[in-house]
């Protein structure tokens, strides 16, 4: 009888502890909420992305339970409970703008792209796949990013290097690079900040490093006849509305001239420098 009572007591304690831990994790995962009032009261909240407590200014009313009067209270309530399994789960979540209408550049781990990318956060709500810096995003979801890159075969690279430039559903303006199969090289375009596809690179070097074999092969396979054909194409602004000075070979003028490129689409008679234009279409000049 005594043993049964002890077992029941132990199980009851276990249930209470588990419930407390889950409740703790719930409010420790909540985003920073300043509240609706206009006061300035220093408080602390648990930053689940960085795994530590940080200070913020509380307005004085409303907000949520991730709000502590001092750092010690925050540490005691939340501590460091995030496991790699937790990180893996929220790194899979989509970028969520949230219900507020602010404009805060943030980073999220994009499972489709296999890397951390920028998006615009509204300022409240959302989920844990939301980081203030790309470094924080990589530090948390880096094992996934590293593994995704390691698992990517040349066939994978070849497949997504053929995808078109996709602005995405958000309305930011972030200069990015994509491999343009028509032009046979990496070119700039304007990314909206969220969604899109893996043919999206922060630098032209990243684009070339990933899709370089295609770019190199395209250039190697390009005969003088190919050059002659696209050097005769007209300058095409493209469907995007960016402002990128480029050069094209003007058959009427018999030389390379500048034009304004919109950022995506267009054709292969499009060069970043006048030297590139002359080197490719030199026989016309």
UniProtKB/Swiss-Prot annotation:
Signal peptide: 1-23
InterPro entries: Kunitz_BPTI, Kunitz_BPTI_sf, Prtase_inh_Kunz-CS, TFPI/VKTCI-like
Keyword Transmembrane helix: no
Pfam families noted in UniProt: Kunitz_BPTI
Record SUPFAM superfamilies: BPTI-like
Localization per record: Secreted; Nematocyst
BPTI/Kunitz inhibitor domain span: 28-78, 91-141, 161-211, 231-281
Propeptide section residues: 24-87, 146-225
Entry GO MF terms: potassium channel regulator activity; serine-type endopeptidase inhibitor activity; toxin activity
UniProt-recorded name of the protein: Actinia tenebrosa protease inhibitors
Taxonomic source organism: Actinia tenebrosa
């Amino acid at each position: 009888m005594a043993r049964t009572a002890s077992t029941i007591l132990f199980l009851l304690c276990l249930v209470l502890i588990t419930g407390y831990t889950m409740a703790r994790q719930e409010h420790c995962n909540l985003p920073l909420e300043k509240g609706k009032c206009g006061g300035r009261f220093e408080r602390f909240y648990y930053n689940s992305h960085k795994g530590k407590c940080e200070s913020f200014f509380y307005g004085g009313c409303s907000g949520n339970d991730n709000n502590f009067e001092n750092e010690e209270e925050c540490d005691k309530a939340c501590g460091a409970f995030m496991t790699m399994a937790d990180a893996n789960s929220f790194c899979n979540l989509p970028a969520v703008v949230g219900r507020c209408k602010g404009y805060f550049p943030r980073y999220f781990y994009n499972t489709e792209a296999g890397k951390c990318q920028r998006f615009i956060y509204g300022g409240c709500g959302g989920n844990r796949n939301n980081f203030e810096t790309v470094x924080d995003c990589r530090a948390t979801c880096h094992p996934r990013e590293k593994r995704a890159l390691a698992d990517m075969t040349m066939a994978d690279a070849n497949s997504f290097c053929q995808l078109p430039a996709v602005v995405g559903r958000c309305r930011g303006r972030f200069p990015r690079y994509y491999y343009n199969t028509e032009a046979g090289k990496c070119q700039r375009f304007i990314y909206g900040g969220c969604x899109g596809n893996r043919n999206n690179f922060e630098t032209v070097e990243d684009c070339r490093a990933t899709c370089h074999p295609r770019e190199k092969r395209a250039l190697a396979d390009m005969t003088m006849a190919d050059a002659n054909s696209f050097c005769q194409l007209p300058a095409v602004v493209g469907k995007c509305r960016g402002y990128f000075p480029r050069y094209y070979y003007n058959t009427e003028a018999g030389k390379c001239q500048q034009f304004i490129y919109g950022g995506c689409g267009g054709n292969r008679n499009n060069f970043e420098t006048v030297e590139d234009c002359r080197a490719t279409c030199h026989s016309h000049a």
